Amino acid sequence: MDIKLKDFEGPLDLLLHLVSKYQVDIYEVPITEVIEQYLAYIATLQAMRLEVAGEYMLMASQLMVIKSRRLLPKVVEQIDPEDDPEMDLLDQLEEYRKFKLLSEKLGEQHDERANYFSKPKLDLIYDDVQLAKDKTVIDIFLAFSKVMAEKQASLRQSHATIARDEYKIEDMMDFVRSRFETGPRLELRQLFQESQDVNEMITIFLATLELVKVHEIVLEQTETFGDIYLVRSEDESLS
């Protein structure tokens, strides 16, 4: 199965998406939290064996430098803004935000004209998966990134080392369906409580997306960065 996420135009676009969730001025966002979310997102894509462009990895290394500097003791000397990688990053984000707004306005004008002459492009991707309150598939991946990081830490502590590769999405779709036998709603992280390795978690996650895509379940996230819940569709029987 080919998986394609929402196309970001580059690492700044991904960072701007994360920053926008806080609904505050760019210079007031909790940058350490944003960095951790970015790194978790990239790590999840790598674990799922999805290709990550070099520019995203370069940004990841720069973010790790910024994060490490924040962990160091504060120094008395005034830091030159030109030598501050954190301020430089925020400046880049602000400039990119302005550029993106202008590009979107121009794009809307172009699309208006194009609709009269051509058919819109159809992509078979998971970007059409929508959550409540205007959430997107990227929010699902961010939530899954957090769950997977927690589960990996737990597996390391329990010294679990057995990994299998033969998990099938079809089987895991049946597994997800079975979890609704006790009720119509469950938390995403509950699906992974008994997972024994990362491959199993990834297959369960992909199975969940597939069930959303075929409208057997819907996903809800009632607050930014909050837990995601799976809700059985009223139009489908999952038993």
From Swiss-Prot:
The keyword Cytoplasm applies. It comes from the Bacteria. GO terms for biological process: cell division; chromosome segregation; DNA replication. Keywords: Cell cycle, Cell division, Chromosome partition, Cytoplasm. Signal peptide: none annotated. InterPro entries: ScpA, ScpA-like_C. It is found in: Cytoplasm. One of its GO terms (cellular component) is cytoplasm. Disulfide bonds: none annotated. Transmembrane segments: none annotated. The keyword Cytoplasm applies. Component of a cohesin-like complex composed of ScpA, ScpB and the Smc homodimer, in which ScpA and ScpB bind to the head domain of Smc. The presence of the three proteins is required for the association of the complex with DNA. Belongs to the ScpA family. Participates in chromosomal partition during cell division. May act via the formation of a condensin-like complex containing Smc and ScpB that pull DNA away from mid-cell into both cell halves. This is Segregation and condensation protein A. It comes from Streptococcus suis (strain 05ZYH33). The lineage of its organism: Bacteria, Bacillati, Bacillota, Bacilli, Lactobacillales. The gene is scpA.
